[in-house]
Amino acid sequence: MALDPKALITRHAPIDRVFHWVTALAVLLLMASAFLPIVGLEFSWVPLHWITGVVLCIAVLFHVVQSTFFRRLKCMLIRPRHLREFAAGKKAAKYTLPQKLMHAVLGFAVLVASATGAIMLAKVDTPLWQRNPYLLDAATWGVVYVLHGAAALAILTLTMAHVYFSLLPEKRAYLRAMIGGQMTREEAAQFHDPARWSGNRKDDPKENGQ
């Protein structure tokens, strides 16, 4: 029996959508508190920046643990055959090559920003600890600042690209799926091979060649 192309299939579980939007809000607040003062908008940005940074670190840690132990981490790995399939125009399983690349590059940038940001907390007075600007020598602090700034610029650029592509008419099904969790079989079939990703994890025990 033919499958109904208008039938809804699940793309994102509720917990994944919550993680995405918490991360998105944290990134937007971090970008605002980092770059708005540079262009002349003055406000007390340090508390907002470090508190939001801690929230982002917790969210990232949750994602790493969840992906490693409760999800199929390998479905996001990029293998040589994925490059060959993309070049040949072959449809992907659950995640396309551009989606995997975005996840990998953005994830790396967020990890660098989080790690360097955690070190920079030594220079911030909080209710939990007193600042210690002498934790590292001047040269090492310079490296930390450069890495943090480069990661922030990368995150800003990738976020703008992510928002742009999510608003394109042909990609809007992904945005709706990130909001409501579902897309139609017809929408999924535009970029995904139904034989490799059906929208039902029970039917895709190995993400079917992902």
Predicted region positions:
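Membrane-embedded alpha-helical bundles that constitute the cytochrome b-like, heme-associated redox core
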Residues: 1-210
